[in-house]
Swiss-Prot record:
Sulfotransferase that utilizes 3'-phospho-5'-adenylyl sulfate (PAPS) as sulfonate donor to catalyze the transfer of sulfate to position 6 of galactose (Gal) residues of keratan. It comes from Danio rerio (Zebrafish). It catalyses: 3'-phosphoadenylyl sulfate + keratan = adenosine 3',5'-bisphosphate + keratan 6'-sulfate. The lineage of its organism: Eukaryota, Metazoa, Chordata, Craniata, Vertebrata. The chain crosses the membrane at residues 2-23. This is Carbohydrate sulfotransferase 1. It is found in: Golgi apparatus membrane. One of its GO terms (biological process) is keratan sulfate proteoglycan metabolic process.
Amino acid sequence: MQCSWKAVILLALVSIAIQYTAIRTFTAKPFHICPVPNPLNCGLGQDVESFDRMCDEYPYFNYNSSRKTHILILATTRSGSSFVGQLFNQHSDVFYLFEPLYHVQTTLIPHLSPSRYAVERRVMLGASRDLLRSLYNCDLYFLESYIKPQPANHTTDKLFRRGASKALCSMPVCDAFSPNDGNIEEGDCVRKCASLNLTLATESCRERRHVAIKTVRIPEVNDLKALIEDPRLNLKVIQLVRDPRGILSSRIETFRDTYRLWRIWRATGRKPYNLDLTQLTTVCDDFLNSVSTGLSRPPWLRGRYMLVRYEDLARNPLQKTKEVYEFLGLSLEKGVVDWIHNNTRGNNDVSAKHKYGTLRDSAANAESWRLKLSHDIVDYTQTVCQHILDELGYKAVNSPEELKNMSISLIEDKTFIPFL
């Protein structure tokens, strides 16, 4: 009973915080009642011009779907999403943000359970959708409610992984680098650029035709339905999936404390009695729910959803990138092609030691988990994740010898055609 009362009080406090954030956002800006044009008339210049004149003071309408394509990379931790994010970050007309929902999570739910209890999940998703809507409309001031300490004069040095966004390390946001500098290292950006001015960041966002956001904090595409159905956002979702066995292996190597019991199992061959199995089952359940929705082709996902396997991208990065860009209606720039050539061939010692690195031998990395996981862990994973493994075309192994035989691929040739 005592825990129940604590849960009720916590939910009430979080709800008040969200409402306060929303009210403060509305009251901080002038309110306009703007007539929304009929989408069928978007090609009629006079109507659109009149609409813009009436609403030019209101950024939500001033940066609508007639001008921008918005992209969301829907992924889970250690699935290759940082690599995919760079495919958009390198495009000169894309404003890219790396995990802005991190701030929502750390502010509202500092102790979010890996199993994502229903109450916490609803709170997190509601706030996340509100923030995404604002960011896609280049309202970066909305972030200030979640950044701690709160920015002063719209300036902060606490934006998570600011250096992972090329737009936030370039003019007009930062003048430390010239346009000819090419690839800007994340650490160099953080060291050489001054604190982030959100007003200049907003200006940079509005100058670009596309906004791309990467997140591992939205469990399923179903959770994005309200945003996808909003015609003003013109949102398209790239769902990135990876073999759950590879995800588990990467997490064991990267998050050593959190996955300590998995490491014990791998080393001793004995499964700890108190192992948190939700660290595996949550990934498979979320994948299955989301992919099942996407592949069932509901009307609200027509032209809005593309499923991409990390392994396909790793084995043929340029061809897969071309397919993704074609689906999104983006031109494949030379800078993106050059980045792919430079960052998917051969090992990179510096990046290999960094848990969030994107420079790697992508083809070799796709199935390297087979040399790191024990067969008993793999066998258990195949049992609890059988349905999603079958759905995505990942083959099971039946012996330690088969697991370590790298001459036999565990990835079926399977094509996932976008729903157009």
